[in-house]
């Protein structure tokens, strides 16, 4: 055949498919075989367009025809001139009839061969990624006709034809594992990504190592719970694979290679604890609060064998600062530091070893930087459930006074005959064991319990083990001399014994301390927890507070003092009925919490003088060193307050002694002799105020109430109202209420702010921190005032409840008795007690509107020489740099005051006393 010169011209519009000749069998599928004509003398553009139109018509018509078997001609290939080095059969595997051969398709003999790569990211199910289809045909290998049309799908469909998809594509690119919370793209070589029935994803290894112990009767129980479902919907959904075949493979592999229960160190609940639902913060950072379960390191208990050795005693463990807050041990086991006398010189009391050791196992020890649920909130939450269900059988103050602190609470199976078991909530106190049958515990805020039984005391409790997971306890029921037997198991038809072993350790050793991570292993924690950490401004937090919904209509906030985990402060908020009906939604809770504006803080304003009320229950002072601490604390306070007033009250609210500390507390016997003293004088704040301050309180007085007695409303001094001690010109008293010993019950609905200290040792430290006191050796009054100004402690105290700010107050003890004039000048906010209106000797003028911008808050008091001799100790306490500004302020006030003549005449006879508010 003759070639025309135009056949060798390569044009971008030229289609080689129209200029080729048959030289053998075609390498096309049957629907691609067409009759090609010889090239004509038309232009390359016309010939290419004509060939394309014919091919398109053929494709549309061939779709309607029935497929036929390949003929021998279908195996022939196109051949071109050797100079062109172009072939239509080597188009990167595009052998399908729906693909068009292009003139730029170069032979694969001259292309680099790239290795086959696999991505670590999961891909949608597709036949292209199957092992059977991984070997694609090469250009130099003739394709197999029986596999080309079926195994290799078209990559590009012709125009007008729908694309057939065999599966729904899912994008897992940004998904994370529900167990380890890491991106699913971070996986080991060959590790699979498992899609769960709930819609979340999990690594294969994460799911396998999370399998827990189970019995043959309940194989599905080995799958852990999905943390994302728990966090998003608050539902317990197991991580079960969506593929049933894969699920069966995992179960069979686990049962074949199952490890005995005694060899398992951790279970899915401890390794991947469910997150409690958290309330999103309002511009504040927070960390989800986790709950972990304690598991004893003792081996499984066999019948009639000796129990595993209890944990180490406290004196066997090195002392260190506590990483776990609000720990407690019975008072009988406490060891107060012998060097209590050193408290006069150094108020930075170190934590005792009893408060620094946690009983949690190292295998489940939480990280130190984790945000944790505070133990007081958990205690109040569980005790509130008891009180809500048994209001007639239980009294709140008796739980704290007679039962002691709550140590453990779990949901266990209880039987009295060893045959019939009932699901109960079990509460282990320091001196009581309480069980209550479960009626309904679906809603964590509406738990229903019934059939309460209290066993106390538990000092003579006898305990034996019948089987590996069955515990038998013999103990006395309350108000009954007969002994009762209780059989305790964790679950029926199960060999699990980790929770039972935890209870065995707690019963055998009263010093075994359970913190917020392991106080419960089977019950949900608080539904809402929020961190209100306050940044003071120098990189540290003053308090770390937590807010929890312990009742459908009660929110409690608990915080601890910076650098002292043994002192806590709490307050509560009651929600109205309209808000309670919408507690199921998080948005309604957020709207309620926005009303909480003041910051929970122990900071108070430094007073001029202090009055301290001590209610001591001597039956609870099992250590003689406690009286030494009380005596040393009072003597230490006299260094800062020479006119310190005291009042001792017994546990029945009767006055034992009162007066000045310098005059009456001269030795330790002054306090020890109060044990045998009795009195008929009932204590009340009104009586104490009229006794110590028969007239108005002219100075800035701080009132402190400390008690270690029972929290009975009619007998405890902490429930009484101390507003009568409000200093003149203030709206509320500068008070501080301290309870020695931690509480189970939350009394925040009756007490605005209550501080709980672990022992008498921390009472003085709490006072120093709250009122800004310091016992440095080279500290004097002038340095204190300068330090207060430079350190901006007046600004830091703005978070407290004290309202003495932004006003300049003038106190004048006038020699004139002008009732009408003085009554008109008294501020309307001042609260006057009955009988004080007839004899007013104090004149107060608030002049905040004329206060210069550079003048601090100053109180000016004009005293006579006879009355002011003892009250002018701080006459020269003012910084020298502010004297000129104060003089200007005084001149401005006197010019605008209607009593300027009175002040000018009084300056000649009476000295002017000035100090900071």
Curated annotation (Swiss-Prot):
UniProt-recorded Gene Ontology molecular function terms: G-protein beta-subunit binding; kinase binding; MAP-kinase scaffold activity; phosphatidylinositol-4,5-bisphosphate binding
Subcellular location: Cytoplasm
Stretches for region Disordered: 1-25, 58-151, 778-821
GO biological process: invasive growth in response to glucose limitation; negative regulation of MAPK cascade; pheromone-dependent signal transduction involved in conjugation with cellular fusion
Superkingdom of origin: Eukaryota
UniProt PTM comment: May be regulated at the phosphorylation level, and by the mating type of the cell and depends on an intact pheromone-response pathway.
Keywords: Cytoplasm, Pheromone response, Phosphoprotein
Modified residues (Phosphoserine): 329
Acidic residues: compositionally biased ranges: 778-794
Phosphoprotein found in the keyword field: yes
Any single Pfam family the record assigns to this protein: Ste5
Compositionally biased residues, Polar residues: 16-25, 85-110, 118-138, 799-821
InterPro entries (UniProt xref): Ste5_C_sf (IPR038382), Ste5_Fus-binding (IPR021651), Ste5_Fus3-bd_dom (IPR021106)
GO CC entries: cytoplasm; mating projection tip; mating projection tip membrane; nucleus; plasma membrane
Protein task: Component of the pheromone signal transduction pathway. It mediates pheromone signals acting between STE20 and STE11. It is absolutely required for pheromone-induced transcription of FUS1. May play a role in cell-cycle arrest in response to pheromone.
Other notes: Present with 1900 molecules/cell in log phase SD medium.
Similarity field: To yeast FAR1.
Protein name in UniProt: Protein STE5
Organism: Saccharomyces cerevisiae (strain ATCC 204508 / S288c) (Baker's yeast)
């Amino acid at each position: 055949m003759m070639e025309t010169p135009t056949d060798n011209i390569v044009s971008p519009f030229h289609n080689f498919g129209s200029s080729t000749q048959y030289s053998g069998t075609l390498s096309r599928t049957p629907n691609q075989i067409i009759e090609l004509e010889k090239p004509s003398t038309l232009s390359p553009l016309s010939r290419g367009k004509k060939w394309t139109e014919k091919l398109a018509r053929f494709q549309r018509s061939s779709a309607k025809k029935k497929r036929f078997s390949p003929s021998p001609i279908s195996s022939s290939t196109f051949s071109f001139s050797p100079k062109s080095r172009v072939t239509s059969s080597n188009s990167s595997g595009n052998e399908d009839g729906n693909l068009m051969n292009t003139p730029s398709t170069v032979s694969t003999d001259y292309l680099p061969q790239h290795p086959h790569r696999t991505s670590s990211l999961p891909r949608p199910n597709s036949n292209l990624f199957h092992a059977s289809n991984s070997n694609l045909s090469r250009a130099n290998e003739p394709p197999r006709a029986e596999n080309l049309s079926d195994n290799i799908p078209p990559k590009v469909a012709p125009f007008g034809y729908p694309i057939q998809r065999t599966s729904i594509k899912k994008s897992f690119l940004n998904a994370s594992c529900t167990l380890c919370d890491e991106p699913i793209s971070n996986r080991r070589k060959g590790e699979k990504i498992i899609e769960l029935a709930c819609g979340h994803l999990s690594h294969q290894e994460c799911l396998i190592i999370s399998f827990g112990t189970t019995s043959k009767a309940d194989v599905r129980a080995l799958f852990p719970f999905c943390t994302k479902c728990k966090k998003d919907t608050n539902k317990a959904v197991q991580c079960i694979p969506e593929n049933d075949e894969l699920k069966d493979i995992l179960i069979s592999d686990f049962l074949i290679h199952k490890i005995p229960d005694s060899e398992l160190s951790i279970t899915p609940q401890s390794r991947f604890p469910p997150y409690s639902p958290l309330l999103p913060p309002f511009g504040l950072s927070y960390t989800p609060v986790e709950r972990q379960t304690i598991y004893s390191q003792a081996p499984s208990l066999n019948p009639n064998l000796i129990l595993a050795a209890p944990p180490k005693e406290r004196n066997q463990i090195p002392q260190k600062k506590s990483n776990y807050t609000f720990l407690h041990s019975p008072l009988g086991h406490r060891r107060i530091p012998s060097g209590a006398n050193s408290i006069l010189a150094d108020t930075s009391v170190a934590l005792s070893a009893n408060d620094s050791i946690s009983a949690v196992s190292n295998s489940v020890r939480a990280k130190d930087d984790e945000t944790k649920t505070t133990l007081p909130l958990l205690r109040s939450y569980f005790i509130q459930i008891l009180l809500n269900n048994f209001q007639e059988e239980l009294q709140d103050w008796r739980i704290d006074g007679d039962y002691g602190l709550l140590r453990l609470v779990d949901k266990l199976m209880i039987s009295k005959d060893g045959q019939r078991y009932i699901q109960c909530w079990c509460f282990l106190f320091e001196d009581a064991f309480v069980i209550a049958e479960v009626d309904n515990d679906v809603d964590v805020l509406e738990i229903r319990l019934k059939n309460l039984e209290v066993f106390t005391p538990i000092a003579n409790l006898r305990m034996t083990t019948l089987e590996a997971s069955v515990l038998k306890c013999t103990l006395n029921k309350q108000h009954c001399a007969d002994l009762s037997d209780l059989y305790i198991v964790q679950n029926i038809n199960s060999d699990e014994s980790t929770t039972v072993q935890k209870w065995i350790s707690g019963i055998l050793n009263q010093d075994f301390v359970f913190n917020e991570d392991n106080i419960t292993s089977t019950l949900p924690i608080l539904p809402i927890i929020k961190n209100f950490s306050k940044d003071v401004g120098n990189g540290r937090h003053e308090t770390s507070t937590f807010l929890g919904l312990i009742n459908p209509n009660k929110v409690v906030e608990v915080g601890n003092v910076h650098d002292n985990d043994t002192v806590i402060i709490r307050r509560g908020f009651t929600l109205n009925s309209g808000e309670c009906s919408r507690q199921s939604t998080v948005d309604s809770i957020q709207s309620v919490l926005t009303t909480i504006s003041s910051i929970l803080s122990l900071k108070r304003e430094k007073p001029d003088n202090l009055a301290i009320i001590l209610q001591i229950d001597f039956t609870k002072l099992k250590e003689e060193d406690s009286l030494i601490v009380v005596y040393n604390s009072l003597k230490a306070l006299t260094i800062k307050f020479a006119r310190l007033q005291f009042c001792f009250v017994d546990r029945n609210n009767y006055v034992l002694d009162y007066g000045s500390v310098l005059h009456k507390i001269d030795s330790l016997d002054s306090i020890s002799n109060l044990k045998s003293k009795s009195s008929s004088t009932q204590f009340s704040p009104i009586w104490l105020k009229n006794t110590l301050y028969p007239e108005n309180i002219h100075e800035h007085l701080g009132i402190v109430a400390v008690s270690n007695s029972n929290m009975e409303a009619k007998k405890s001094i902490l429930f009484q109202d101390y507003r009568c001690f409000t200093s003149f010109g203030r709206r509320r008293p500068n008070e501080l209420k301290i309870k020695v010993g931690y509480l189970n019950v939350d009394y925040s609905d009756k007490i605005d702010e209550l501080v709980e200290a672990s022992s008498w040792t921390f009472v003085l430290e709490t006072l120093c921190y709250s009122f800004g006191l310091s016992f440095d050796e080279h500290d004097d009054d002038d340095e204190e005032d300068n330090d207060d100004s430079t350190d901006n402690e007046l600004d830091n105290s703005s978070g407290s409840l004290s309202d003495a700010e932004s006003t300049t107050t003038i106190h004048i003890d006038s020699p004139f008795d002008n009732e009408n004039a003085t009554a008109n000048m008294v501020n309307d906010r001042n609260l006057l007690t009955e009988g004080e209106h007839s004899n007013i000797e104090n004149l107060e003028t608030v002049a905040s509107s004329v206060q210069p911008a550079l003048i601090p808050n100053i109180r000016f008091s004009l005293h006579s020489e006879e009355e002011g001799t003892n009250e002018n100790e701080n006459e020269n306490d003012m910084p020298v740099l502010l004297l000129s500004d104060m003089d200007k302020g005084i001149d401005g006030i006197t010019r605008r005051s209607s009593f300027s003549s009175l002040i000018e005449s009084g300056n000649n006879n009476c000295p002017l006393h000035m100090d900071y508010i």
